[in-house]
Every structure is written in structure tokens, then in C-alpha cells.
């Protein structure tokens, strides 16, 4: 009798647990189709599940997300009028309490479980997707490649200087030992044993890159991509997924991009423009400066200050030298923080924020009246911003392409 009672009790417990799991599943796991109403106009029907960012992309609505949906950039904002659940702690570092009360959410953090009513920026509807072909993918510096893509014939990406596109990467495995690196850059690759790394990605990923090309360069998209290797203090960390994929691309390969996106645009004023860049932050600097001079024929005073470690890290030198020779309102300067003996460098040395201050802004009549456009490593951006604040420059005249977080 006790055995039978035990079996019955065990069966009851198992059934109770099964019912609890089914109940929880009904609450936590979405099933069936849901409808998302967009801007009081479009109604999208799709299977429940996943995040709102991906759900919209599956319907051809590409909300910008510089971090590829990781929740760190804060750019994939939408207004959720109904559905979507409560705002998550991961969103509150990007969204103020007032914005939260108005329904502002990060679409990469919103679960698609029930019918929703949302608003997205109107410019999102102008975003498209293209399958491009790799023209070239050459080293411009030790850790920077210039990826040049051909847009499909008859198409164009209607971007503004300072804008960016998003690149999709399929699941892949990339071995750094297979990279084609010119011998002049091998010294650092050998020093840090970068050939050892392998990047393995099991699902599609999405990342944003600022364009180095400017709108008059028709039919192509140019990017400057820095390889994201593990930091020296954490050598066993995985290398950057998207940068590893991009560095593996060869002429003729197909690449899917979407865009254009952006907010790092030049102001339409007569103020002096001061561009400050470093590393792969060269990309939007080139796009802006070429656009101002070659397309807009701007008469504004324009200076460009670029920081690099050594001459090996300098690129587009001939391009900017030609601009300086052609346009008297443009000058450019490079500062090397760690020049090599063989560089025979007699130009500026030190960190770029100090060089800009000592050689341009220290005795400037009104630095607060200039517009400052910058893009570079986080430490550079922070140093430049502090220097500008100390000079009395207002936030509205400090424009930053913050690709480094």
C-alpha cells in the first residue's frame, strides 16, 4: 500500500510540475502571430518572439544600432505606446526618466510577445539594404584596413558626410594566420603574436561603421576598419567578431550592408571648423573634409589635426596634401606620439589634444566660436573634450562620432 501511495504522490508531483512549466511557458514564451502598428499607418504581422529591433528589420524597417543590438550604443530608440512590457534596467543608462514616461525604449531590448503600437523616426523608412561586392581590402596602417565596396549597378546609398552604414556578417570562422598583411607591418603583428587568434561566430552579427567616402564618390562605399584584437592584459579574450570578418574579405566577396544612418553631420554655418581624429576615426574626418571642400566648395576656415603613433600609422597623406595645395582655407597637421628612429620625424610630437592646444587654440582669438568635429579612441575624445571645456567651448559646438563607446 505504501508503495502504491508513493507512486501516486510521485505522479501527482510530476503532473503538478508539468502544469507549472506549461503555465510559465504560456507567460514567458511567445507563440503565434502578433501585430505591430507603426506610426499609426503600417500594420506588420509576424511571429511572436525575439527582440523588436530584429522583428522590424525582418519587415524591412532598419532602426539604427551602432552596437548591433547589444544595448550599449543607445541609438535604436523607438516610442512604444502599448505592448512591450516594462522598461529594463539595461535601458535606463540611455533613457531619462522623462523619456521613459513618454514611452521611449531601446528596440534591441524590447521583447516581442504581444500586439504593439510603436513610433519610429520617419527617416528610418529611407533605409535600404544592398548586397555589395568587395573591390579592395588593403592595409592602410598596422591595424587598419580600407574596405572599398561596389554598390550594385544603378543603385546609390544616399548618405550625408559623417554618416554610417551597418554591415551584416554570417556565421564564420576566421584564422588570423590567413590574413594577407604586408611585411612592413609584421613587426607589431609578430611582437604581439596576433597570428594566433581565431574568431568563431555561430550566428549572424551586425555592426556599424562610419564612411570614409563622401557623397560625390559615386558607386562605392569606403570604410576604415581597425582590427579589434584582445587587449594585452586579457590575451585570452576573443578578438572582435566583425572586424575579424571584415579583415578576411577578399576582392569579389559579397557583403550585405544597410543604411544610411547618422547624426554626426556638419552644421550649416560660417564658423571655423576644427577636425580632430585618431586611428580609424580618420573615416568620418575624410568624409567631412572632402565633402566641404570638393562638393560644397566651402570657404570656411578648416583645419585637421590627426594623431598617430608613428609614420607607419599615417594614411591618406597624399589626399590631404593635395587638398591643402588646392584649397587655401584648408590646412592639416599630424602629431606622432611615439615616432620610430627610422621615421626621421621633424613634425609635431605628443598627444594630439596637447598639440592642438599649443599650436592652434592657445592663442586663438575665440576658440569658443569654432565648431569641433572629432572621432578617435575614447581616451583621445575624453582628453580633447576636457581641453575644449576648459577653453569655454559650449556643448553645441563639440560634435563627436563616438565609435569607441
Swiss-Prot record:
HAMAP family given in the database record: NqrF
Superkingdom classification of source: Bacteria
Record PROSITE patterns: 2FE2S_FER_2, FAD_FR
Record's keyword annotation contains Iron: yes
EC class (word): translocase
Protein name, UniProt field: Na(+)-translocating NADH-quinone reductase subunit F
Domain 2Fe-2S ferredoxin-type residues, every copy: 32-124
Cofactor note text: Binds 1 [2Fe-2S] cluster.
GO cellular component: plasma membrane
Record's bilayer topology term: Single-pass membrane protein
Ranges where the FAD-binding FR-type domain occurs: 127-267
Species for this entry: Neisseria gonorrhoeae (strain ATCC 700825 / FA 1090)
